[in-house]
Design a protein with these regions (language model features):
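Membrane-proximal N-terminal amphipathic helix
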Residues: 38-71
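Carbohydrate-recognition beta-sandwich/jelly-roll modules
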Residues: 97, 106, 119, 145, ...
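GGW-centered surface loops in extracellular recognition modules
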Residues: 75-157, 161-164, 315
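C-terminal juxtamembrane segment of a hydrophobic transmembrane alpha-helix
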Residues: 22-44
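C-terminal, surface-exposed recognition/capping segments
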Residues: 321-324, 345, 349-406, 410-421, ...
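N-terminal leader/signal peptides at the extreme start of proteins
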Residues: 1-10
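Short aromatic-cysteine micro-motif
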Residues: 143-151, 189-447
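N-terminal signal-anchor/signal peptide hydrophobic helix marking the start
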Residues: 10-19
């Protein structure tokens, strides 16, 4: 077999030159070759038309595939080891769904259903003698026990948006996004009923996203300066719950008021393998360096926990842009959008905390060892459990669908105060589903309350911070720097940094707030911008933050481990 070698390029160039020379010798003028109607110009035009035709054909094929799958969004990109699932409310269990989505069995991103696509991974050896292979080949409707699940992810399809109301304001219950889903990895709008068939980039809008024109959300783009991944994506998979450790037990069975092992209390477990599950304590007390490491180790799957094929996917810690991609979809007609400031609508807080409290050298208050539980909801939207409180021994009552806990307040002089009781609801209950981004079981949980979540975003100028120095060496697709030289926590310095990043969009910061030092974000969420000694972003609030926790909450931290800092994993 004859192989073409490196000199092929030279041969082709020589051939083109030869043809041009022959044409000139034959009396064909340069103008006839290069003019508007010249041979070369027409050849370029034909090449472009062929390329455009091929792109259109590709888009048409994707649309046909969507129609075949009853889908108005990009078909979820299933990776090896992923099992599509649906919820059986009668049996309170996840079941294998039809991956061809017949009858919208798996997902339906309509404004009525708000049924976002969910997948699970399972253990290699599961309960009842089953294996991972059994579930991967199981028929539609096969139940998957929660104990067998190692991760749960939710599909966020590629979309475009503009800020319909509340742009750069402190919009309390009135901020809203208009959303249009896109075809494949293109900027073509699936439903162009509003007269715009192609979404734009902000370079065409003077950086504004409130002009009534749909803009491609940067989380799905190759623009790493705005939180893209270096590739154009048809969508991303987002952890359904805050991350946890593989060894953490369901319902905190190994935790009581007498527990002193901090690896158990903080959900660190063996400090190795990540899971994404409901009804376990989230993994806290972990630095940003280690978050990035354990998140990326998921795709390697060295412990055979997930069934992934490392060569076909990437897993990493979440960035602001990806948080924004979830938040914007949630704050639209496709998600759990608050209509008014009524105390009922919107995403309810996960205010669960078992409040293991110990004596402190600081006589002001006692030290709290917060113990969370993923996917829970309080009894009201803005519910909170005081950070300075402890569980009354023996008061925790697991009622199946809910958990009731009585606490004792800790006074400022470290003496005990009054008792109070909170009720928390499982993620699948009526109240529990209010804590989801869709207000049903198919959304994403723990984005309001639970634990603050570290993002892979930071002030790039804070090179004296060890973690910033480390992150500066990481590939751009895994992290995004923010500008700003403000060094202190003063309003002036925070504002300086906030203003320096007004060109960023899609990250649920500038577009969804009018300030950075208080409660200036949408829905009166926290808004405190990073500064030199606290250069990293954290999002969402924690169990004790009440009304200021939420989708649009952002705060600063130094990257170190704390007992109320967790993280979330993204897969693409």
């Amino acid at each position: 077999m004859i192989k073409m070698k490196e000199n092929n390029g030279i041969t082709l160039i020589a051939l083109v030159i030869t043809i041009v020379v022959l044409l000139i010798l034959a009396g064909v003028s340069i103008a006839m070759l290069t003019g508007n109607n010249g041979i070369l110009t027409q050849a370029k035009k034909a090449k472009q038309e062929t390329s455009d035709s091929a792109q259109k054909e590709k888009e048409d094929l994707i649309k046909l595939e969507m129609i075949a799958n009853n889908s108005n969004v990009n078909i979820p990109n299933l990776k090896e080891g992923m099992i599509p699932v649906k919820w059986n409310a009668t049996n309170k269990t996840w079941e294998v769904a039809d991956k061809s989505n017949t009858g919208n069995d798996w997902y339906d991103y309509s404004t009525e259903s708000k049924k976002w696509a969910n997948v699970v991974t399972v253990k290699e050896n599961c309960s009842n003698g089953k294996t991972r292979a059994d579930y991967l080949s199981a028929g539609v409707g096969t139940p998957i026990p929660e104990d067998d699940i190692t991760t749960m992810f939710v599909w966020i399809p590629r979309y475009s948006y503009y800020v319909k109301s509340g742009y750069h304001e402190n919009a309390n219950g009135t901020g809203e996004f208009a959303i249009k889903f896109l075809i494949g990895t293109s900027d073509k709008i699936i439903d162009s009923s509003e007269g715009q068939d192609t979404a734009i980039r902000t370079s065409n809008t003077n950086g504004k996203t409130n002009g009534g024109k749909y803009v491609v959300h940067p989380a799905f783009t190759a623009d790493t300066d705005l939180g893209g991944t270096g590739d154009e994506l048809s969508g991303i998979w987002v952890g359904k719950f805050e991350s946890s450790n593989y060894t953490s037990e369901y319902n905190n069975k190994n935790i009581s008021t007498s527990t002193t092992d901090e690896d158990i209390l903080y959900g660190c477990g063996d400090n190795k393998n990540v899971t994404i599950r409901p009804n376990v304590t989230s993994w806290r007390y972990i630095t940003v360096d280690d978050i990035l490491k354990v998140s990326q180790n998921i795709s390697k799957d060295e412990a055979k926990i997930y069934g992934f094929k490392s060569s076909e996917l990437t897993t990493t810690m979440m960035q602001n842009s990806q948080w924004g991609a979830v938040a914007y979809l949630a704050q639209s007609e496709y998600g759990n959008m608050p209509k008014i400031d009524d105390g009922e609508s919107g995403i309810w807080n996960n205010s669960y905390n078992e409040g293991i409290t110990f004596g402190s050298n600081n006589s002001y208050r006692m030290d709290n060892r917060s113990v969370t539980l993923t996917g829970m909801s309080g009894s009201s939207r803005d519910s909170a459990t005081s950070y300075y409180s402890k569980v009354v021994d023996g008061s925790k009552k697991d009622n199946g669908d809910s958990i009731e806990i009585t606490y004792t307040n800790i006074n400022e002089n470290a003496t005990t105060g009054d008792n109070y009781t909170n009720i928390f609801y499982r993620y699948y209950t009526e109240n529990g589903q209010k804590a989801s981004t869709t207000r049903n079981i198919y959304g994403i949980y723990d984005m309001s309350g639970g634990s603050w979540e570290y993002m892979a975003n930071y002030l790039g100028s804070s090179i004296e911070n060890t973690f910033v120095s480390n992150f500066l060496k990481i590939e751009p697709k895994y992290q995004t720097q923010y500008a700003g030289t403000g060094a202190t926590s003063s309003t002036e310095d925070r504002t300086l940094n906030y203003e320096a990043n007004k060109g960023k969009y899609g990250d649920a910061i500038w577009e969804t707030s009018n300030g950075c030092n208080g409660q200036c974000a949408w829905n009166v969420d926290y808004s405190n911008f990073p500064y030199a000694s606290n250069p990293f972003f954290i999002r969402g609030g924690n169990y004790s933050d009440g009304s200021v926790a939420g989708l649009f909450s952002f705060y600063s931290n130094n990257g170190w481990s704390y007992n109320y800092r967790s993280f979330r994993v993204v897969l693409f």
